[in-house]
């Protein structure tokens, strides 16, 4: 799955924060603050939640957040906290009651974490097997999920609805581009999904490249539409649309290949191919809490200060829901002809 789909660098705030205020008292020296990040996805067998700790500081007792983030014992609570997710469903009078299903969170160690802000390559995460519970949901009911984390005498809670159903899909099966200058646009259409307040889409064009009769190397160019609220999207019935310019693919390839011709010493004997369905569309739907979190951090940027938005009671972070899907699609005959006509070395296989 593409990293940028709803990733929004959620882990970027798992660090130690300067003193400020909302619902948690941050003025005690070196007080640990629960920081929680979790996105429920009903289509996945396993859902992961990060439960870490940050430390407040003040000017008299400063903390270097970057140094602490690299120390596993500083970011993690000792042992395993009692954590679980309780399912609720709507009933008479729009009241929500417990269904009896509880997702117990266990811990596991991820061993392939790349180097970055936080300690690596081994990181502790919490997880739950929830697909069996989610698949029993009735389409005529609404559901919400409440997270409970017990830390000593404190209980941290958060709540979210569940985004998505099996009708969520991309309808478009082919993209249409042209090489000639054009101000026109085309659309990618997809079916809306319950509880989503925004969608994030990207398409990736994959191709193969061989230099001097060497081995084929996979290349790609991508275009991101960015996170769009449902109010920003065109809609017809239950179908949303996003628009892309007809020249988009050719502009991307021109930037990637670096010239309008391959007949020069830097590109000898370059041959390129593409598959019958060379474009992958990545689409994600996200819940209200995640959208609010993205919007706030887009305005303030990431820093060592506590973000203005959190839906974690007794801590910080975000607990929300998303649904990701991918679809491989073709490109029109005109697009193929225009690609073969450019001096970029594209050939039919």
Question: Which residues are covered by each model-predicted region?
Answer:
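Positively charged n-region of N-terminal signal peptides that target proteins for export
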Residues: 1-4, 21-22
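Residue-level detector of intrinsically disordered/flexible regions characterized by low predicted structural confidence
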Residues: 4-5, 221
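C-terminal motif of bacterial Sec signal peptides marking the signal peptidase cleavage site
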Residues: 16-19
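A sequence/structural signal for flexible, mid-protein segments enriched
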Residues: 21-349
């Amino acid at each position: 799955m593409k990293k940028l789909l709803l990733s929004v660098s959620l882990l970027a705030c798992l660090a130690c924060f300067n003193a400020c205020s909302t619902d948690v008292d941050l003025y005690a020296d070196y007080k640990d603050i629960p920081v929680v990040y979790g996105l429920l996805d009903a289509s996945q067998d396993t859902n992961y939640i990060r439960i870490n700790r940050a430390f407040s500081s003040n000017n008299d007792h400063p903390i270097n957040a970057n140094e602490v983030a690299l120390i596993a014992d500083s970011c993690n609570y000792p042992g395993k906290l009692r954590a679980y997710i309780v399912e609720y469903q709507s009933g008479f009078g729009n009241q929500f009651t417990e269904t009896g299903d509880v997702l117990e969170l266990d811990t596991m160690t991820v061993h392939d974490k790349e180097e970055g802000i936080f300690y690596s390559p081994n990181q502790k995460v919490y997880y739950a097997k929830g697909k069996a519970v989610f698949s029993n949901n009735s389409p005529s009911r609404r559901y919400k999920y409440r997270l409970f984390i017990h830390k000593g005498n404190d209980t941290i809670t958060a709540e979210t609805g569940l985004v998505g159903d099996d009708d969520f899909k991309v309808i478009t099966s082919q993209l249409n581009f042209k090489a000639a200058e054009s101000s026109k646009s085309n659309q990618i259409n997809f079916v809306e999904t319950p509880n989503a307040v925004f969608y994030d889409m990207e398409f990736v064009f994959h191709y193969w490249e061989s230099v001097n009769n060497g081995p084929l190397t996979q290349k790609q160019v991508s275009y991101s539409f960015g996170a769009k609220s449902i109010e920003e999207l065109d809609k017809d019935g239950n179908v949303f649309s996003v628009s892309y310019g007809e020249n988009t693919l050719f502009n991307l390839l021109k930037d990637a290949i670096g010239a309008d011709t391959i007949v020069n010493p830097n590109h000898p004997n370059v041959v390129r191919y593409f598959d019958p369905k060379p474009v992958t569309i990545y689409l994600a739907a996200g819940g209200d809490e995640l959208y609010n979190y993205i919007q706030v951090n887009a305005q303030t940027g990431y820093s060592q200060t506590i973000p203005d938005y959190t839906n974690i009671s007794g801590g910080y972070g975000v607990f929300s829901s998303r649904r990701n899907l991918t679809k491989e699609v073709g490109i029109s005959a005109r697009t193929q002809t225009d690609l073969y006509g450019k001096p970029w070395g594209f050939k039919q296989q």
